[in-house]
């Protein structure tokens, strides 16, 4: 911006008339104030960028070596965008009013004039009126944020009042797409290829600057606006005409960058709208845009995971939306996922071999855990449609390694999360993943001071490690047992109708019985007792069905179809018990949130 | 000589003044004066020479005598008396000066008497010195020096005075130099002393054996560094000096006999060496108890025991080393353990005697500390080696013992006597078998005593080792079975509750071949009780949980039992069912991360895979339990269980009924019609009545190797062509599939991806919902926003007003422009 200012000054000195010089003397006083404000905004942006860039580099260099290659690609994107910014951005030419432009030095938009133009554009698709309207739209979008360089000093646009301002923006955002399509003779369901063919259309040559001006102004509005609903409305309308961006790749990249930023930092509605734009871009345009969207979102997601937040409620949304984007093109996402999971496996292997504090801390960092969470959800979402067996195998090994890296009660939350992941993968893929040994090991977490009844509030701790004080509390042990029962319940629910359920449940039931004999807390005893009874009743249930069967373990298909009717029927006793446990778990989660 | 000196001395005083007067007065008598002067000079020269020689000789004698007297004073007191004689010599030096200064006759006479006495003493000393000390070369040097000094004295008398004055500051300088020695210099001096003494001993030990005492005295120094250096130096010296044989002191009779000089020297040398060595060892043992010298003392003791295990006082060394076998200091403990391992593995140096003593001492040590030692203390036994020959007579004894059962005599003495008789009989048999060759007889005669002694020593070693092992087993049982009343008295030691149990069981497994049949029954009973310790202690409180044996420890007991039976080729009819029962139950109690999976895999291999005779019921029970085990544990454990399961099914064809679901399986299952998953006895579980349904779930395992193995096992019955023996053992399977070793990369990557987009419709539904509301809200907010921007316009207007009147015409022009714009619009509308 500073560079442009200098050029503008030189241009002004050379080309201005004496009378216009006087008017310039008056204007700088007003502009200086706004210039200072702009500088402040820019400085703030620079500081934020510096802060953001540093942790990204550290993360990329340290843990994900292959992704660092993508970082170089990202830099190239930034350079391209910067080049795009340096293009000259001026008002459109008004051919009809050339004679008037010499006389008129300042144009003010009035209500009546606006109404006339709107009617002409809306009903008759009169191109000159559209040109004027887009110029006023540009002025409205940049109102209060005019750039210092003006290409046409003889024209100055101003807006009469607030109502006119609002009408201009709303009308253009609502009607622009329809108008463009009607002029070009396109339908609403036109595809990218048709738009690319527009280059052969003679009308496109005259209409292209208008479309470009519209998009540029809209992007500027999205950048500068601070209001929630204005941005949301703008993004919603921008989605409708996103196909036209095929002709403007620079603007497309700029939009991707802005959308990723809003997706990560915005609130719920803005984040959703931004994600929808990114999704449309990845669906409509070619594979390069998909790659850039995926890479930018992935980096932003990991960067966001590094920052500790009080409210981490939005993170699941970010993760789910990223998974949804990856699911659009599983072929390409598979490549990215395999690279990332391989990196996770290497880090884990180092930690298992050396047991260094640094290596273990990397494994226990929020970034590593959230990355595993991301890929677990991705594989769970797509494992039935596609063949993701290698990814599934590797990620399960990684999760087992993380759970067994350090055995101790302080890492209870991490272990519970790992087992949740394994249960999730098993449920969605239909593959058997044993978790009993991991779960039952938590029964061995013995607390010293059993008599103490410290009712410390178990707030939702997002950290991986628990403080030492909590290990002595009674609530901790209760949480251990409830987690064990919940996890086993989920595991058994998946296989409760499988022919080998009695054998699967033998060892866990035996361990729980011993625990039941050993423990002295009545509440825990009651819960464990009920769980054991339910499992045993289901064992008898399956046993009776199994005795009537005529096939042998060789016959895999008939084994799979075993008890299908009972499975669909939701009145099975264990299913009801499982639902009650899940409801209790949800209830406890709600209480925790409150 | 004395008389001549008296006459000469009387003459000079009267002659000197008149000669001078004559010279000054008469010039014509110059010739006469010259002659007289010459005669006087000749007389003076003779006098001066004798005095100078006497003085010079006296000084040299003093210097030499001082040196030798210093040395002799350490040895003899007589030399001190001679030192007293020197004092008489000192005033002699002073006398001639005074005589020259003083002119009184009386003083000169009194001094003359003293001079006479001194002269006599000097003469005697010269004679002694010449005989003993001075050599020809030294004599010549003295003669030259005397001549030089004579030339000097020819010049003038005052030169003598100057020389005398020079001597006194030298003495002062020496005194000052001595005072300047600081502690550091004394430290270095002591270091040098240690080095010199060491070098002397190493160069010629027989001649310099007495210096050992000097080095031992240095050990009493207060500086710890010097003490350490002295100890290490003595260690190096003793290493080299000590001969390759054991020193035997002479008896009283031998002392009375006449001995040659050479024998006297060697005896003196040996007795002195032994005394010094003994005192050195005593000091080491004392220093060992002090924390400052603990490590160095132990290092010296261990090094000596390794270097000279054959020498005298080795018992004391061994006692000290064994005492520190379970020292809390890790460095000391490692030193001692490695030393004892060295002794066990290098019996050639000491003939095996130290092995017996060491094992005995360790056994006593374990007994004294009530089995609460560091595990390293007993791992040492693994280095002991026994000859293969020991087994043969033992086996013969075993056969004979079977016959002895009728007699029922079990006293040790009788057994020893009977063994001797048996040995004689065996020898006779050997003689009878061999053709009566002379060479065979000679060989037998020459080697018999060595073989006998060696067997005795090794049998004693074995008995001590097994005594220790059985004590540990008994102690373990006792601690587990303690009553609640004795809880506070028995606390686990610093090394854990049962630190010696694991090395004890490992040792038993190694030495099973040397174990007697009589002890096997006891051993098996102990192992049974230990392995089944959980059932008997089930009612105890939580506080006792630390005393219970872990799963891996109980698995070790089962392992040892099977190894014992394996090595004896199942000679005994011992019931091993209890161990199978324990293994059957321990499989359920296994916990990865806390218990060792390697031991589980090893026990599966030895007890199930390598077992020859198995009951069908038992095999089926284990097959079923291993399948259940594979469903609940990680890759490594599951894989080892499946490998074992496959091996069992391959060996027992009838057990393959588990792979099929036959309605009429009642006849095969036997008495029990239903499978009891929680049964504790494998024979009563009724496993044949069930089917291996676990395999259908395991075939869906996420690990491809496990799913493949499960599929192979389930198809074993139908496709018999695949029944080849698997080369993989449970141990290898466990090692290969553990998380640390296994690679995380999948081997076969198949990228056949089928894109199915089914979720496109869902997000579209969410689009329409917020639009309606947003339109209204956005309008309202934009109006507010524009209001804010109106404020900005007002600011602009203010700026314009503030500047000057010049703005007014610009405004007018703007108004004109606006008016003109309106006009064309109206025309267009028309």
Curated annotation (Swiss-Prot), chain A:
Region (Disordered): 1-21, 35-58
Nuclear localization signal 1, short sequence motif: residues: 8-15
Disruption phenotype: Plants lacking both CRC and RBL exhibit strong floral meristem (FM) indeterminacy with reiterations of extra floral whorls in the center of the flower associated with reduced AGAMOUS and SUPERMAN levels.
Basic and acidic residues composition-biased segments: 36-58
Transmembrane residue ranges: none
Locus of motif Nuclear localization signal 3: 512-519
Tissue expression notes: Expressed at low levels in roots, shoots, leaves, stems, inflorescences, flowers and siliques, with highest levels dividing tissues.
Protein's UniProt keywords contain Nucleus: yes
Gene Ontology process terms (BP): floral meristem determinacy
GO cellular component terms, A-Z: nucleolus; nucleoplasm; nucleus
Keyword Transmembrane helix: no
Pfam family, one: Noc2
Function: Collaboratively with CYP40/SQN and ULT1, influences floral meristem (FM) determinacy in an AGAMOUS and SUPERMAN-dependent manner, thus contributing to the floral developmental homeostasis.
Other comments on record: 'Rebelote' means once again in French.
Subunit organization: Interacts with SWA2, NOC2 and NOC3 in both the nucleolus and nucleoplasm. Binds to ENAP1 and OBE1.
Protein name, per record: Protein REBELOTE
Species whose genome carries this gene: Arabidopsis thaliana (Mouse-ear cress)
Gene assigned in the entry: RBL
Swiss-Prot record, chain B:
Motif, Nuclear localization signal 2: chain positions: 408-415
Biased composition range(s): Acidic residues: 118-129, 159-168
Comp. bias regions, Basic residues: 141-150, 817-830
Location of region: Disordered: 1-22, 67-86, 112-169, 391-436, 802-830
Location within or outside the cell: Nucleus; Nucleus, Nucleolus; Nucleus, Nucleoplasm
BP terms from Gene Ontology: DNA replication; ribosome biogenesis
UniProt-listed InterPro entries: ARM-type_fold (IPR016024), CCAAT-binding_factor (IPR005612), Noc3_N (IPR011501), Nucleolar_cplx-assoc_3 (IPR016903)
Residue ranges the record marks as coiled coil: 61-81, 111-156, 400-429
Motif (Nuclear localization signal 1): 138-145
Function of the molecule: May be required for synthesis of 60S ribosomal subunits and the transport of pre-ribosomes from the nucleoplasm to the cytoplasm. Also required for initiation of DNA replication.
Family note: Belongs to the CBF/MAK21 family.
Protein name: Nucleolar complex-associated protein 3
